[in-house]
């Protein structure tokens, strides 16, 4: 009897917490809507950090995306995002819920995707979630499975690994805005990326967790070849924004690699035992010095 009473009280507590969480989410959405309306007036900015705010994004991407939505014409209100985890803290979730865009998201974990498909917003909004480990061979077929039109509004690639190689291979969609994660530890002096490995895993590749992805200069060069202009980075120094050249205007403008580059301050490095080392600045590059990288200009494997 006592156990039954305890379980009943526990269920009541869980419901109260869930209700409080839902209420807090509504408040965040309302505040985000106000901030989005305010961004309509921001026609001249010095950097993307001027328009940043976060509701569901990990950093200031929610604000940047709303600013872009307010100042670029998007005929198709669709987005695609790779590497979304459980989607609670995601770059496109506010766009889904505030602007009612349609989305296609993928993650390598079936458990994460199950959490997404069991969520309330999966019922209330037009979102497709697929469990898949994305590589250069399957990315185009996976994108086609969304049944979206070729011109997609926003594409975000955040795979902590083969990001450069995946973006290079994509040809079945033509996004207006592309958000690419870059590794600022690699600097911008060399257009480099980790060599392609279909099974690349950031932690397995090197215990430090610092050896992954591509330099901003590599992504900048590839995007230019694909017809995109660089407009800046998040103030956190992890995501770079590119806009298709035909969509640039007197508000959304191209900037130089040097002007838009932001160095991250993340202290996420680890030792061989998996403990955080809190390495900062040049110490992070020193921890992975000598590891192989592919230079996209020389078509050669070099050392960091």
Task: Map each language-model feature to its residues.
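SAM cofactor-binding core of SAM-dependent methyltransferases
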Residues: 49-157, 184-187, 269-271, 275
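Hydrophobic packing residues within well-ordered alpha-helices of enzyme cores
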Residues: 116, 143, 166-170, 242
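Active-site glycine- and acidic-residue-rich loops that bind
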Residues: 156-166
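Short, structured coil segments at secondary-structure junctions
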Residues: 98-99, 173-174, 226
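A short alpha/beta connector and helix-capping loop motif
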Residues: 126-129, 165-204
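N-terminal auxiliary segments of SAM/dcSAM-dependent transferases
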Residues: 2-39
